[in-house]
Amino acid sequence: RDSRIAPTRLLAAAAAAAEDGPRTFISASAVGFYGFDRGDTKLTEDSSRGDGFLADVVGDWEAATAPATDAGLRVATVRTGIVQAAAGGTLRLLRPLFSAGLGGRVASGKQWLSWIGLDDLLDIYYRALYDDRLSGPVNAVGPEPVRNSEYTSELARVLHRPAVLPVPSLGPRLVL
């Protein structure tokens, strides 16, 4: 919690106090803002904050940009989904499990998963920095979410491995 909120607040205050300093403040954020599971509701940047620990942390994280906003800087908070990259992101964690034949859906598999490729995420940060039209929350996700069961089936297909062992719903909550 504090590893995200305190540094963001300090950086926002420093940017706000700098004479001839930046006119833009970009902060990382997360789609965890929307909560763990909102069912089939389509979520946009205008959607309300969800419930739960992660939603509370992300809400406080975004609120930590207030010094920059109050000083008149253009502030964008990039709400990032699950990052996909060949050598990192979520795949770095999941590939060994799936390669060992231990991969599978989480709980029912019906949860929506909003993801983004690393190159697209970098492009969003670049645009947030230089495009004056971007301010406030910016969802850094692909155009359509997928169900967890679809994601795990596709990952298993690409890796030529089975996806038969479901992960209990408690597993991801312990990690987060």
Question: Which ranges hold each PLM region?
Answer:
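Alpha-helical substrate-binding/gating segment
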Residues: 66, 95-103, 111-145
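NAD(P)-cofactor binding segment of oxidoreductase domains
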Residues: 1-25
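Catalytic helix-loop patch of NAD(P)-dependent Rossmann-fold dehydrogenases
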Residues: 2, 38-77
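Glycine/proline-rich active-site loop of Rossmann-fold NAD(P)-dependent oxidoreductases
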Residues: 59, 71, 84-93, 128-138
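Mid/C-terminal beta-alpha module of Rossmann-like enzyme folds, strongest
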Residues: 124-175
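Glycine-rich "substrate-gating" loop/helix at the edge of Rossmann-like oxidoreductase active sites
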Residues: 49-54, 81-87, 108-118
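Conserved catalytic-site region of short-chain dehydrogenase/reductase
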Residues: 27-42, 49, 83-88
